A protein has these predicted regions:
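C-terminal cap of metal-dependent C-N hydrolases
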Residues: 6, 336, 346-375
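Active-site gating loops and adjacent loop-to-helix segments of metal-dependent hydrolytic enzymes
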Residues: 77-88, 128-156, 198-210, 221-234, ...
Length: 375
């Protein structure tokens, strides 16, 4: 396939008029059309890399923790329809016996139709019982290296991120022991600045949904956010215009940079469906518009109801984040953060031919996956 006359988001993180050539599923340097090759005129359209979501839970009534092929395929199909072509869905806080079936289902899944399953984000259960958010406090436990390794074996090595509250007893030791086996993310935590620094020095490299379920910044208690800033950590950001004020979103891009900000959806099973009652992590949630909350605790946000593409779009159109930065934060940066950037997250030669064509209002006009138009 050849895409001509597009305004292409280049590996230099700028937009330039150009042509994208895709052969055998991957982007190649410019080449003349072959006989019978499909040529698509993208005049007036942006060509964006397929997005990479490293933290979401569900959509269309299915949750990754359903632990079934049907659920995974539903998520893969939905995400692909929204231009998200590589997914690393997140688990919730459950006991090992429950997580076993989730890992088994992920390991058995074969990529083909829909977004590629490229990893698993193990969001629980190694978190703080005081900062569970929408996680189930009943199953919170200390970080357990043997348990992680058993789950990783069942998952066939798919676990790319493990979330840890470093202040909990033994959790710093887990970071020291396991950081060379998996990326460690600071999450659902009450940690202070000094303990967060120890966590990053021990090998943590990532922070889960920045600002949410963690202490904030004050001038006498800088907390984990400043520690992350000082230690080159990559940070997740939910830009659904519910979780974080637009000014704080802009502040984060200005301080961390788009090479360290990973936009995420953190969406629940309600994403893509009407308002109503759903569940997340075994707890009832109520959805109204873009806002999802625990039904029994309506002041507690329970994931989002927005897909990653729409989070990126809102960051640009509602929060005044530059398009170039928002695109990078939804594609290349998350791909790098979990080590799949040789295949995903960029329109550089050698990467998969995953392309979104969008108009100037960022409405999706086409989605191309590995050189095949699927939307």
């Amino acid at each position: 396939m050849i895409l001509q006359n597009a305004l292409v988001y280049t590996p230099r993180h700028t937009f330039e008029h150009g042509t994208i050539v895709i052969r055998d599923g991957r982007i190649v340097p410019f080449a003349a059309p072959e006989e019978g090759e499909e040529v698509l005129d993208a005049e007036g359209l942006y060509a964006l890399p397929g997005l990479v979501d490293i933290h979401f839970h569900g959509a269309m009534g299915k949750d990754f923790c359903d632990g079934t092929e049907e659920a995974i395929q539903t998520l893969a199909d939905f995400e692909a329809s929204k231009g998200v072509l590589a997914i690393c869905p997140a688990t919730m806080t459950y006991p090992e016996e429950f997580l076993n079936k989730v890992m088994d289902a992920a390991a058995a899944h074969k990529n083909g139709k829909g977004a590629d399953l490229v990893g698993i984000n193990m969001e629980g259960p190694f978190i703080s019982p005081k900062k569970v958010g929408a996680q189930n406090p009943e199953y919170v436990q200390g970080a357990d290296a043997a348990m992680f390794r058993r789950l990783q074996k069942r998952a066939g090595g798919l676990i790319k991120l493990v979330d840890v509250a470093p202040e909990e007893p033994g959790n710093l030791d887990f970071i020291r022991e396991c950081h060379n086996e998996v990326r460690i993310s600071i999450a659902h935590t009450c940690t202070d600045y000094d303990t967060a620094v120890k966590a990053f020095e021990a090998g943590a490299t990532h922070m889960t949904h920045l600002y949410n379920a963690m202490p904030g910044i004050t001038h006498r208690a800088p907390g984990p956010i400043i520690a992350a800033m000082e230690h080159d950590a990559e940070v997740e950001l939910i830009t659904d215009n519910v979780h974080i004020h637009p000014a704080v979103v802009r502040f984060t891009f200005n301080t961390f940079g788009d090479d360290r900000v990973c936009l995420i959806a953190d969406s629940a099973m309600s994403c893509g469906l009407p308002d109503g009652q759903y569940s997340l992590g075994g707890q009832a949630i109520t959805v109204k518009g873009p806002r999802a909350t625990l039904t029994e605790h309506p002041d507690t946000i329970a994931g989002s109801n927005t897909c990653l593409y729409d989070c990126m779009k809102r960051a640009v159109l509602e929060m005044n984040v530059p398009l170039e930065s928002a695109v990078r934060a939804a594609s290349e940066t998350p791909a790098k953060s979990i080590g799949v950037d040789n295949d995903y997250g960029s329109l550089a030669a050698g990467r998969y031919g995953n392309v979104i064509l969008a108009d100037k209002e960022l409405n999706i006009k086409a989605v191309i996956q590995k050189g095949v138009r699927i939307i």
